[in-house]
């Protein structure tokens, strides 16, 4: 009985520590989303929102969020990307 109680205590402590390790937030310098390639233009009516990638990413990018919760990377230098961003900002 004592062995199983001790084993249970060790197991519970291990699980608690494991949970803390994997639920900890990333450091402030860890980018959350980066674009490694750019997608093609999609119709504006499918776009719900956007955000810019971190400056720590290897290349600049804009990530458009579609109404179906998909993410599409785009080149921020493209004219259509800038137009979509302007429209989204005006309608916010």
Swiss-Prot record:
Q: Which SMART domains match?
A: SCY
Entry's CDD domains? Answer: Chemokine_CC (cd00272)
Q: Which GO terms describe its biological process?
A: antimicrobial humoral immune response mediated by antimicrobial peptide; astrocyte cell migration; calcium ion transport; calcium-mediated signaling; cell activation; cell chemotaxis; cell-cell signaling; cellular response to interleukin-1
User: Per the record's keyword annotation, is Iron included, yes or no?
Assistant: no
Any Gene Ontology CC annotation: extracellular space
Q: Give the GO molecular function terms.
A: CCR chemokine receptor binding; CCR1 chemokine receptor binding; CCR5 chemokine receptor binding; chemoattractant activity; chemokine activity; heparin binding; identical protein binding; kinase activity
Protein's UniProt keywords contain Disulfide bond = yes
Q: Which residues form the signal peptide?
A: 1-23
What superkingdom does the record give? Answer: Eukaryota
Q: Where in the cell is it found?
A: Secreted
Expression induction or repression? By lipopolysaccharide (LPS).
Q: Which InterPro entries match?
A: Chemokine_b/g/d, Chemokine_CC_CS, Chemokine_IL8-like_dom, Interleukin_8-like_sf
Write out the similarity annotation. Belongs to the intercrine beta (chemokine CC) family.
Q: What is this protein called?
A: C-C motif chemokine 3
The organism's lineage is: Eukaryota, Metazoa, Chordata, Craniata, Vertebrata
């Amino acid at each position: 009985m004592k062995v199983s109680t001790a084993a249970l205590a060790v197991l519970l402590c291990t699980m608690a520590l494991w949970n803390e390790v994997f639920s900890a937030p990333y450091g402030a310098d860890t980018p959350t989303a980066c674009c490694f390639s750019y997608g093609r233009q999609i119709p504006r009516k499918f776009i719900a929102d956007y955000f810019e990638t971190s400056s720590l990413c290897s290349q600049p990018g804009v990530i458009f969020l579609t109404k179906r919760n998909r993410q599409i990377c785009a080149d921020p230098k493209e004219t259509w990307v800038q137009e979509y961003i302007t429209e989204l900002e005006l309608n916010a």
